[in-house]
Amino acid sequence: MITDARVLQPEFIPREVQHRDAEVNYLSSVLNPLTKGERADSALLYGPSGVGKTCIAQFLVEQLRGEVVALNYQYVNCWEDHSRFQTLYRLLDGIGKTVDIHRQSTPTDVHLNRLRTADDTSYVVILDEVDQLEDKSLLYDLYRIPHITMILIANDEEDLFASLDQRLNSRLTDCERIHFDPYHENELIPILHDRVHWGLEEDVISDSHLQLIAANAGGDARVVIGILRHSARTARETGSDQITADLIEEVTPEAKSEIKQRTVDRFTPHQELLYNIITEHGEISPQDLYDAYCTRTDDPKTKRMVRN
């Protein structure tokens, strides 16, 4: 049933990207100076979850690495590495400069200086979920390092810029902005075809059943891949050689729940507290949410941070 399980994971970088030609071409043109040894402009990729932002950023950088010998690259998920120290540590790790870094005692200024004084090889930094950075002044510091090119990824452009101070806003105002719309249902089917071709045995699922998966996904590529993965696993575990419509309908809620749980599992304690309050109350106004939040923590964040 499953010939390559990696292909069924959301983190898998495909060999080609479907139905994102305009976005791929735009970002490729932004990054083109790197092929000449020059710094590229910063880029912001924004749009809802599951529309291919992360996939395309990584896909294009991997292609660049095949063309440019002297190119360093690091991907950072700022939801997981949200503190200034964590982000800088990951960036230093990307160029092999963490050998004598001590998590408890090394000042972050030392990390930043080490990035500045590293060799001048072009360094592409993808900061995913960048709005989750606790200290966004780090973006200003990275912007000022000549050999670093930043690709920022966020869900909402306005929310991101509203959270930046004036100094940083002025620096990033001219960054190249690329908007990603949700996939249409018929655009998700070629994505599924590729995953089936690369990761499953032949003839285990029909085109009509791929259409059913796409119809259940709400324009989210993560969901179609999740449903396909759960369907293939369940078919294998039950000894079936086909993925049926009944099986797809059965696993769809579980696949969607898994994606939601992955998000919840990455919450910081403050985000988890906010999530629990919203879950308890259902609909709740921003002010009531903040008031309830403040009563449950001894160290509340500002209203702006809570809103973000």
Curated annotation (Swiss-Prot):
GO terms for molecular function: ATP binding; ATP hydrolysis activity. ATP binds at V51, G52, K53, T54, C55, Y183, R195. It comes from the Archaea. Signal peptide: none annotated. SMART domains: AAA (SM00382). Pfam families: AAA_22, Cdc6_lid. GO terms for biological process: DNA replication. Disruption phenotype: Not essential for normal growth. InterPro entries: AAA+_ATPase, AAA_22, Cdc6_lid, ORC1/CDC6, Orc1/Cdc6_arc, P-loop_NTPase. Keywords: ATP-binding, DNA replication, Nucleotide-binding, Plasmid. PANTHER family: CELL DIVISION CONTROL PROTEIN 6-RELATED, ORC1-TYPE DNA REPLICATION PROTEIN. Belongs to the CDC6/cdc18 family. Involved in regulation of DNA replication. This is ORC1-type DNA replication protein 1. It comes from Halobacterium salinarum (strain ATCC 700922 / JCM 11081 / NRC-1) (Halobacterium halobium).
